[in-house]
Amino acid sequence: MKAAEIREKFLKFFESKGHTIVRSSSLVPGNDPTLLFTNSGMVQFKDVFLGAESRPYSRATTAQRSVRAGGKHNDLENVGYTARHHTFFEMLGNFSFGDYFKRDAIHYAWELLTGVYQLPKDKLWVTVYHEDDEAHDIWAKEVGVPVERIIRIGDNKGARYASDNFWQMADVGPCGPCSEIFYDHGPDVWGGPPGSPEEDGDRYIEIWNLVFMQFSRDAQGNMTPLPKQCVDTGMGLERIAAVLQHVHSNYEIDLFQALIKAAGRETGVSDLTNNSLKVIADHIRACSFLIVDGVIPGNEGRGYVLRRIVRRAIRHGYKLGKKGSFFHRMVADLVAQMGDAYPELKEAEQRVTDVLRQEEERFFETIEHGMSILESALADLEAKGGKTLDGELAFKLHDTYGFPLDLTADVCREREVTVDEAAFDEAMARQREQARAAGKFKMAQGLEYSGAKTTFHGYEEIVFDDAKVIALYVDGASVKEVRDGRQAVVVLDHTPFYAESGGQVGDQGVLANASVRFAVSDTLKVQADVVGHHGTLEQGTLKVGDVVKAEIDAVRRARTARNHSATHLMHKALREVLGSHVQQKGSLVDADKTRFDFAHNAPMTDEQIRRVEEIVNAEVLANAPGIVRVMPFDEAVKGGAMALFGEKYGDEVRVLDLGFSRELCGGTHVHRTGDIGLFKIVMEGGVAAGIRRVEAITGDNAVRFVQDLDARINAAAAVLKAQPSELTQRITQVQDQVKSLEKELSALKSKMASSQGDELAGQAIEVGGVHVLAATLEGADVKTLRETVDKLKDKLKSAAIVLASVEGGKVSLIAGVTADASKKVKAGELVNFVAQQVGGKGGGRPDMAQAGGTEPANLPAALAGVKGWVEGQL
């Protein structure tokens, strides 16, 4: 049974049991800032399990794309060298949110494994938590698993409830026992059952984990039964495929074999058991899907992990003798294997290929540069008879140039040199400590809230007359009242205030009644459906239970809406002008502007910017209505709605049709495109490799910008005594005149310098047969100084000359030495002798050198010392 069929049968089986098939979420978690990557099926349901989010179903099943590389869950170094470690894997799962519990979960698992997949019952073993009699009895008395194949696992990790068979989301919160299902490969494979001394062998392989969220654990370790008991299960597709395809390594399944063959083809290696081919096959999956989900190779966070995986794959190709780009060509092979299951991969194929190709080219330049540094260091080491490469140098190669330690070690090994890995590790530890202190991925600081949700009315209304205060916070702590002058967060049962989300800033405004006035400076989400109004109480005392009138700043909201709607039109226009590879990578929409980051590999041309402006303003002039519909996510995407990579969407989504644009969006927008008024791009630039940024303005801001620009053009035209329409022509004429005058001035300076040069020749002093001259040439530029030095060298025959000029508080110096004298007197040393005394430095050839300085007051003394310096050289 092929992997694709196994995946499909799993999802269809649970669909037949009343489960909703939920698409895989992004590898970039949308609801958990503590995670680098989605690493299990339950991540997208975390808020559901915590009660902070509701879904329209109580049963779900998924095939979740997952990555474990970087952070707490990091399998990277084991990948390719063990049978079951991967950076990327698919987790098949079924979930119950307060619906069924242990009995159904266990029966479903058994039915799928033995009925649908037809695994022999006598090959299956199970484990349960040692206190979970309920699960034990279901397995033994209802399913019929012999008790000798049901193993109770106790607290085997050194503390109460610290067990392989007891799951907990965190130190506090939902937790519960779990039951794992193992497959027995038979006595021909070494290993013992779980819980035995030989459990690390390969005979008994865990294939499925059933987690029963049964309790809530408090800070003191007390367990309280959850009001809604939940189920979270996970079965690795690669592991179950290995079992069903009768192989002992995940790399032998059909999906991996196709990719390993592709790696062999690209590297010219015929031995398909080579571990480096396994590494490459694994890494093409992780890299491609991370790029699909919007991650770009970079130097920090997720981008750094992606870059590390890409470079590890390239390095293994390099070890196999592949000295040029190859990795990006495997994207097509991956699409052939997984494109049907994940259409987003197929759609992004060209973009993924381009990103990987660019990263490869960049890294091969790194390898060449790193090899040059390493070869030089090894040559020095060999000359000294050393046999150990400095670990600090190895770390510098790794940290500064991206040169992997194992590649450094491989090169050294060929020279019978070892790397001081202890020093390398010490340097690495210092860097990790610095990174840890920087805390790139810290737990989001939130407010503890367990009350009612906030009903949002802001799409239709800007005022809500009877909003009830249901919670108050001061300095992060819940309070019953807030007094005049205090900053606080107010939670209402109803609000027209939009909470910051999707790049759009939160509303500002006022909460008030007859005795209270609270100025709202920002609006943020406390939870998915709970809105916090942040601000200052300007009058009265505000209490929980008070009723207030909630009114937003309507002018600010209207300006923000114009900018947000313009962003949608601009996104569509950018895709038309630059190509369908353009994907949003970030945005900020406020009352002043829209800032939009997108994937594109080159600066936009003036013509492309102009074309985008034309397209957007044509949509504005069309004055098309904005139409909002709520529908299932899959229906929206099938209907052409653009979903943004990395955004978290529910199963019901809000679709905005605005002119020629159709996007999923929960923000606030104009009623018609004409409300935008005018659209103008004011900035375009790069923010990272492969990421461009555009800033644009709309409405009255755009009108003021154009008026200001018009005023500046008129002022410039007046200065040049031209009509605004003739400004370009007039500027060209002025530039031509300036060039002509500069040419005349240069000729005059040269002529003047030549005449001064004739006079200066008579000032030369002969020292040891060499004419020495050090003088200032008034009004001369560097070019004139150089020409004069050349003429003086011809005239004086054997000479050492320094000429200087001063302009704008800066010193220019030229030194010239004739060929016969340059064996002893070097022009570079001569010019530096003078430059150091006038606050500068310089250099050049033995016969001609240039320098500058910033201390002209010291110039006379410096020139006076030239004769003695030259005399010392002779």
Swiss-Prot record:
It is found in: Cytoplasm. It comes from the Bacteria. GO terms for biological process: alanyl-tRNA aminoacylation; negative regulation of DNA-templated transcription. CDD domains: AlaRS_core (cd00673). Its cofactor is Zn(2+). One of its GO terms (cellular component) is cytosol. Its main location: cytoplasm. Its EC number is 6.1.1.7. It holds the Pfam family tRNA_SAD. Zn(2+) binds at H564, H568, C665, H669. GO terms for molecular function: alanine-tRNA ligase activity; aminoacyl-tRNA deacylase activity; ATP binding; tRNA binding; zinc ion binding. Keywords: Aminoacyl-tRNA synthetase, ATP-binding, Cytoplasm, Ligase, Metal-binding, Nucleotide-binding, Protein biosynthesis, RNA-binding, tRNA-binding, Zinc. Binds 1 zinc ion per subunit. Disulfide bonds: none annotated. It catalyses: tRNA(Ala) + L-alanine + ATP = L-alanyl-tRNA(Ala) + AMP + diphosphate. Catalyzes the attachment of alanine to tRNA(Ala) in a two-step reaction: alanine is first activated by ATP to form Ala-AMP and then transferred to the acceptor end of tRNA(Ala). Also edits incorrectly charged Ser-tRNA(Ala) and Gly-tRNA(Ala) via its editing domain. Belongs to the class-II aminoacyl-tRNA synthetase family. Consists of three domains; the N-terminal catalytic domain, the editing domain and the C-terminal C-Ala domain. The editing domain removes incorrectly charged amino acids, while the C-Ala domain, along with tRNA(Ala), serves as a bridge to cooperatively bring together the editing and aminoacylation centers thus stimulating deacylation of misacylated tRNAs. This is Alanine--tRNA ligase. It comes from Paraburkholderia phytofirmans (strain DSM 17436 / LMG 22146 / PsJN). The gene is alaS.
